[in-house]
């Protein structure tokens, strides 16, 4: 068993994401995602795929077909029984729609106001270039 646990989101983190197109649609794999999950496993990480997607069978099949390594989906079986409802425990969470809290709520509120997922910034930049 691993000492380190990581939760990784799917959309916008492992695969490209612009908008929801249904549970059976997954964007293309982001370059480096597969090799990163392999390296994490080699380095002893327990990988939880953590997503708002609910169909674990579809997720598992897609990840297997895409050669994305993982240990579980939306749950950490290593958590105590009384802590299994809700967010899985992990040492690190990787998500395209997260802000790292640094203890300063004033700074965090400013970051929330200006926040855009990384792929949305690219789309806005392309649209801006097209309109010029």
Predicted stretch roles:
Residues 1-132:
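HAD-like aspartate-dependent phosphatase fold
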């Amino acid at each position: 068993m691993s000492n380190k646990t990581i939760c990784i989101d799917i959309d916008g983190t492992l695969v490209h994401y612009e908008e929801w197109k249904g549970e059976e649609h997954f964007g293309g794999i982001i370059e480096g995602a597969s090799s990163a999950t392999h390296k994490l496993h080699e380095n002893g990480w327990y990988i939880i795929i953590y997503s708002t997607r609910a169909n674990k069978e579809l997720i598992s099949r897609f990840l297997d077909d895409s050669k994305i390594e993982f240990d579980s989906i939306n749950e950490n079986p290593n958590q105590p029984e009384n802590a299994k409802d809700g967010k899985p425990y992990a040492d690190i969470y990787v998500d395209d729609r997260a802000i790292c809290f640094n203890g300063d709520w004033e700074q965090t509120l400013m970051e929330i106001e200006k926040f855009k997922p990384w792929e949305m910034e690219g789309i806005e930049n392309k649209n801006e270039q097209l309109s010029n």
